[in-house]
Structures are given as C-alpha cells and as structure tokens.
UniProtKB/Swiss-Prot annotation:
Taxonomic lineage: Bacteria, Bacillati, Bacillota, Bacilli, Bacillales
GO biological process, one term: transmembrane transport
Matching Gene3D superfamilies: P-loop containing nucleotide triphosphate hydrolases (3.40.50.300)
SMART domains (UniProt xref): AAA
Name under which the protein is recorded: Uncharacterized ABC transporter ATP-binding protein YvcR
E.C. number: 7.-.-.-
Database matches in InterPro entries: AAA+_ATPase (IPR003593), ABC_transporter-like_ATP-bd (IPR003439), MacB-like_ATP-bd (IPR017911), P-loop_NTPase (IPR027417)
Organism of provenance: Bacillus subtilis (strain 168)
Molecular function in Gene Ontology: ATP binding; ATP hydrolysis activity; transmembrane transporter activity
C-alpha cells in the first residue's frame, strides 16, 4: 500500500508579468509504501525544499497529482486541509519548533490536545512513547532545560504521537553535533522499525541519510536516481557518497561524517 504517490508533480514560479521565472520541480514521480524510511538528497536548488513544501501542503503544485493516504490534498478546502495536515502528517524540523512556554510533556501531547483526545488515552500513548524513546526523565522539563538532541527526540515523539500517515523530517540533524545527530537518527530509525512509521527525510548529511532504507536523488528539479540499502549501513553510506559525487554540485554542501 502506497502512503504517498506523486505523478508528474511540477512546480513553476512565475514573475509578476506572468512569465516563467523558475522551474523548481519537473514531472516528479515518487511512491512511498507504508512503513518505508525514504531519504531525499540533492544539491542546493535541486528541488528538495519545493518537494517538501508540496508534500506538507503549504504550497500547491502547478501541475501533476499527489495523493497521501488515499487523499488528494488539492481537493480539500482550507479548513479541511488544515485538519488533514494536523491528522495525516507529522513534522520534524531542523530547529525543533517546540514551544518554550510548555513542558516537554505538553509539547508532545499538543497534537492530541488539539484533537480533544481523552486524557487517559493521551497519557497512555505518551507513556509508551517516552519509554521507547527513553525521554521519560525530561518530560516535566522546559525546552531550555534540555539539550538540543533531547529537544529533537521530543519533537520526534510529537510527530508520531497522533499516528500520522506520513512523517516529514526536514534536516532534523542540521543544528546538532555528531553525537546528538546520531541519537536522533537512531530515534527515527526506531520509530520506523518498531512503530512502522512511514518517514520521508530531506537531508544534506550522508550519515543521516544512511539510516534510511532508500535514497532518492534530485537534480535540477527532476528525479536523478535512487539506491536501496542492504544489511550493511557502512556500505550504503559509501554508495550515497559515490552517487553524490556523480550527482555533482558543490560536494562540500554534503556533510561527510563517517557513520
């Protein structure tokens, strides 16, 4: 079963005079099955951010089709789209996007509170998730009282607690040191393995990408190639670097820490 399906997805930005100024994404096809962990990589300006914005439903395609969990977002009205985004999607951002005025517990529970889930169920979900991610000891802390890595793990918990169809992770390790980054990627991999979370990760970091099961490479707004991971993450990491070298662009954009 495909959780995500795009067909001929394109995004063109126009000038004020109506002439084409930039073709950000061109005829892009992508299928993501339930329980997959897929990475998106490419040089700056390749179309990664545009693709993510379209999938997040904060921008609309110029043409093409996109279906998430059997629903076409473009057919939804504004209020329906906001509800769809809240229930079907989970987000993990580079800068965490946790609210400083709330505790870690309250931040994680926010999606359930907005949906008016019963308190007993909220606490049960949180208890299980906090156990899995080993963050029980920070639940009653404020965001500024915990490390960046702990904040991002809390953000991962918030992204999945409402059981979304798809989690979109945008450079989730971008603001972290290598140790914290590895912990966060282990967290996402754990959610994928144990909770069968379907995750789409956009990253420049080859090490972060090596935690995925499949990498799709974009160049100039178009599909370039894809590679699949076997049993050895180190071999997959090297395959990612090899593909990036063929892909071109500024190779120094890509963080090449060894896994």
């Amino acid at each position: 079963m495909n959780v995500l399906q795009t067909t001929n997805l394109s995004k063109t930005y126009y000038s004020n005079k109506g002439t084409i100024s930039y073709q950000a994404l061109s005829a892009f096809d992508l299928s993501v099955s339930k329980g997959e962990f897929v990475g998106i990589m490419g040089p700056s300006g390749s179309g990664k951010t545009t693709l993510l914005n379209l999938l997040a439903t904060i921008d609309k395609p110029t043409q093409g089709e996109m279906m998430i969990n059997g629903i076409q977002p473009k057919t939804l009205k504004d209020q329906e789209l906001a509800l769809f985004r809240r229930r079907e999607l989970g987000f993990v951002f580079q800068d965490f996007n946790l609210l400083d005025t709330l505790t870690i517990r309250e931040n994680i529970l926010l999606p359930l509170a907005l949906d008016k889930v019963k308190l007993r169920e909220m606490e049960a979900r949180l208890d299980e998730l906090a156990d899995t991610l080993q963050i029980k000891h920070i639940l009653d802390h404020r965001t500024y009282e915990v490390s960046g890595g702990q904040q991002q793990r809390a953000a991962c918990a918030r992204a999945i607690i409402h059981n979304p169809a798809l989690i979109l992770a945008d450079e989730p390790t971008g603001n972290l040191d290598s140790k914290s980054a590895k912990q966060v990627m282990n967290t996402l991999a754990q959610l994928n393995e144990e909770k069968e979370a379907t995750i789409l990760l956009v990253t420049h970091d080859a090490t972060a990408a090596s935690f995925c099961k499949r990498i799709v490479f974009i160049k100039d707004g178009r599909f370039f190639s894809e590679i699949h991971r076997g049993t050895n993450r180190q071999v997959f990491y090297q395959s990612i670097l090899d593909t990036l070298s063929v892909l071109g662009g500024d190779f120094h954009e890509f963080e090449n820490y060894r896994p």
